[in-house]
């Protein structure tokens, strides 16, 4: 009688309905609660398992297409571990960085492996007033310093009033190649003339496209079309004082530029190593790095990066293999 009253009180069974119906409904409710609990537990376990098998990578814009290719190809060999690119202030398991910026990431990572090099060239908008002013100049390192940086210490022989009309655009983002370009000429990134552009270095291309007097600089992967392998149609390289064979290569395809810069390093061109910073306590990360060094670097040219020389490349492979061995 109590069970029937309780059922009626809870609204499980109505007046006049069989008490057995009440019992059946109670059993069904209890079973449903168990099923819901089991599903929640399963989903919670599955989510935790998925999170444990996800690793994250940060990469500057110029290297992002290459990293995306690594992730795509690595997934074919190791489907149990997923690597994802993250942006902004989000923490990551790995970070692709220019060697010149290594100090900025040492607080979060304790190891660095080099995977290639990036080259930075001065550019302006095609057929712009800046391109006209710089036409035929063939600037050496000294004249490039005068064009891009503040300072009154330059010799009279390199002073050029035409330079004073030109507006320099440089990146202010922490991952910008501005510091690499500046350090190549013995300068600091705080000493650029002109205007600073926040955000991705790709915005530098947009800035000079809008300003007829604008000049800037960027990585090869940002100034060449990775599909056609030619300089982007809206851009023009600033003429540099280079040896004839180097200058001829700069008039060719991206692959010609990469090849010549792997064999010679003109003072007028900023070339910096690109590396991956990481912690050494994750076997999945170390195995991914081993794959990158053995298989991923073959995509360097495709995505606008120079290859390391053989000695440096072998040293990186030895480094990651020793870390894998040490963990066994």
Segment roles from a protein language model:
Residues 89-110, 223-227:
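Pocket-flanking alpha-helical
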Residues 50-78, 86-88, 111-118, 123-328:
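Exported/periplasmic ABC-transporter solute-binding proteins
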Residues 6, 11-16, 46-48:
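Residue-identity detector for glycine
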Residues 3, 20-55:
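Bacterial Sec-dependent N-terminal signal peptides
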Residues 8-10, 25, 186:
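General secretory precursor processing signal
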Residues 39, 99, 220:
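Residues that line or immediately flank small-molecule/substrate-binding pockets and catalytic motifs
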Residues 16, 23, 288-289:
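Short, Φ-rich (hydrophobic/aromatic) sequence segments
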């Amino acid at each position: 009688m109590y069970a029937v009253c309780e059922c009626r009180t809870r609204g499980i069974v109505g007046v006049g309905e069989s008490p057995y119906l009440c019992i059946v409904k109670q059993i069904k409710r209890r079973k449903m609660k168990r099923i819901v609990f089991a599903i929640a537990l399963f989903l919670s376990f599955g989510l935790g398992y998925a999170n444990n098998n996800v690793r994250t990578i940060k990469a500057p814009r110029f290297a992002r297409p290459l990293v995306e290719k690594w992730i795509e190809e690595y997934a074919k060999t190791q489907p149990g571990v997923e690597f994802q690119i993250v942006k902004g202030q989000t923490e990551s398991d790995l970070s692709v960085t220019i060697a010149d910026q290594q100090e900025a990431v040492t607080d979060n990572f304790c190891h660095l492996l080099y995977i290639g090099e990036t080259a930075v060239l001065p550019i302006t908008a095609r057929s712009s007033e800046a391109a006209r002013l710089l036409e035929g100049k063939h600037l050496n390192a000294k004249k490039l310093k005068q064009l891009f940086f503040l300072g009154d210490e330059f010799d009279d022989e390199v002073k050029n009033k035409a330079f004073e009309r030109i507006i320099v655009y440089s990146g202010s983002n922490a991952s910008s190649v501005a510091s690499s370009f500046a350090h190549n000429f013995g300068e600091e990134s705080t000493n650029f003339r002109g205007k600073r552009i926040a955000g991705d270095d790709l915005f530098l291309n947009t800035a000079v496209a809008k300003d007829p007097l604008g000049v800037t600089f960027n990585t090869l992967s940002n100034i060449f079309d990775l599909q056609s392998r030619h300089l982007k149609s809206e851009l023009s390289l600033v003429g540099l004082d280079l040896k004839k064979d180097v200058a001829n290569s700069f008039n060719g395809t991206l692959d010609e530029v990469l090849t010549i810069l792997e064999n010679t390093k003109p003072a007028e061109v900023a070339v910096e190593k690109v590396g991956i910073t990481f912690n050494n306590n994750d076997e999945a990360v170390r195995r991914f790095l081993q794959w990158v060094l053995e298989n991923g670097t073959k995509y360097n040219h495709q995505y606008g990066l120079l290859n390391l020389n053989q000695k440096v490349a072998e040293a990186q492979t030895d480094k990651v293999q020793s870390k894998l061995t040490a963990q066994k």
